[in-house]
Amino acid sequence: MRYAVLLAVVLLLGAFTAEAFSPPPFHICKWKLWKCLKWCAPWDWKCRRKCFWKYWWCLKKFGGHYGGYGYGDDGYGGGGYGGGGYGGGYGGGYGGGYGGGYGDVGYGGGYSGGYSGGYSGGYGSYGHRRKY
């Protein structure tokens, strides 16, 4: 009986300790920035600019809060805020880049930009690159 009480106390303490500990929150935007920069060559300023633009747009979508894959991520509804980011804005929101984007979307970006080139993609939409 004494061992049962001791085991119950240890299990309760373990449960409360595990509940109290929480790792630092996962920030999807930082992870995406890291993955994007990993694919860029050190001297490729266009690729890096695209990555930081995507990071800025991700922070704008998530409000800078910690969060997972939710509202408007990766072209949900055509690239963030209801199909085109900034009210149609720079060629389709996330991954759209300026006027259709550079990189994932390709030059020209096609129809609404969005994720992975939208409708026509322009110059093959860089299909050989990994999509984040």
UniProtKB/Swiss-Prot annotation:
<protein>
    <recommendedName>
        <fullName>Glycine-rich protein 3</fullName>
    </recommendedName>
</protein>
<keyword id="KW-0732">Signal</keyword>
<feature type="signal peptide">
    <location>
        <begin position="1"/>
        <end position="20"/>
    </location>
</feature>
<dbReference type="GO" id="GO:0005576">
    <property type="term" value="C:extracellular region"/>
</dbReference>
<keyword id="KW-0964">Secreted</keyword>
